[in-house]
Design a protein with these regions (language model features):
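Cleavable N-terminal export/targeting peptides
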Residues: 1-31
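Repeated loop/turn-to-beta-strand initiation elements of outer-membrane beta-barrel proteins
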Residues: 36, 62-69, 95-99, 135-141
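Transmembrane beta-barrel strands of outer-membrane/channel proteins
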Residues: 38-44, 71-75, 102-108, 141-145
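Outer-membrane beta-barrel architecture
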Residues: 39, 55-59, 86-88, 128, ...
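Solvent-exposed loop/turn segments connecting transmembrane beta-strands
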Residues: 42-53, 73-85, 113-114, 118-120, ...
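Residue-level signature of outer-membrane beta-barrel architecture
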Residues: 58-62, 89-93, 131, 145, ...
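Mid-length scaffold segments of soluble, non-membrane domains
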Residues: 74-105
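Outer-membrane beta-barrel "beta-signal"
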Residues: 156-169
């Protein structure tokens, strides 16, 4: 996988703006619901399952147009750590309690006994599909890609498949 989800996150937001009636404040700051999520799953390096990861993420409650601000941190069993900040775009069904999210984040990677990702600056982008249980929370399946976007000579990246539970604050 490459930066496809990063591009989709931006394009989905721009498409949302183009079909909504938001002018002249399409990128205005807004308050949105805050959420905390915790997820766990498998880490893949060049299609091989190499590790397990736990990931904690917070949606801050601040949005600029269709993009919601988010930050998070993850740790693997092999003592690799990542922490970053970015944006997510969410689409929710009006007729069923289902949703999809795309996210794009930049952050710092500290290598333990895990894979060499080329350097400390790493970008994380991905997609999540889930079910919204209302006031009791949400359950989703996520897939994301982490790499340095070619700023270092080594740029193989990691993929993560996780089960995520989130709840509102």
């Amino acid at each position: 996988m490459d930066g496809t989800f990063a591009v989709l996150t931006l394009l989905a937001g721009f498409a949302d703006i183009s079909i909504s009636d938001c002018k002249p404040n399409c990128y205005a700051e807004a308050q949105v619901p805050q959420r905390i999520s915790i997820s766990a799953g498998q880490v893949y390096y060049q299609l091989d399952q190499v590790d397990t990861e736990v990931y904690l993420r917070k949606q801050t409650g601040l949005a600029f147009g269709p993009w919601r601000m988010v930050y998070g941190a993850s740790a693997t069993q092999r003592r690799d750590y990542w922490a970053g900040v970015g944006v997510l775009y969410e689409a929710a069904s009006k007729t069923a309690p289902i949703f999809a999210q795309l996210h794009l984040m930049s952050g710092l990677y500290a290598r333990g006994a895990g894979e060499d990702l080329g350097g400390p600056i790493e970008f994380r982008s991905g997609i999540e599909f889930g079910y919204d249980f209302g006031s009791t929370g949400r359950l989703g399946v996520s897939y994301d890609h982490r790499s340095n976007a070619g700023i270092y000579a080594t740029n193989f990246g990691l993929e993560t498949v996780q089960l995520r539970y989130s709840w509102g604050l």
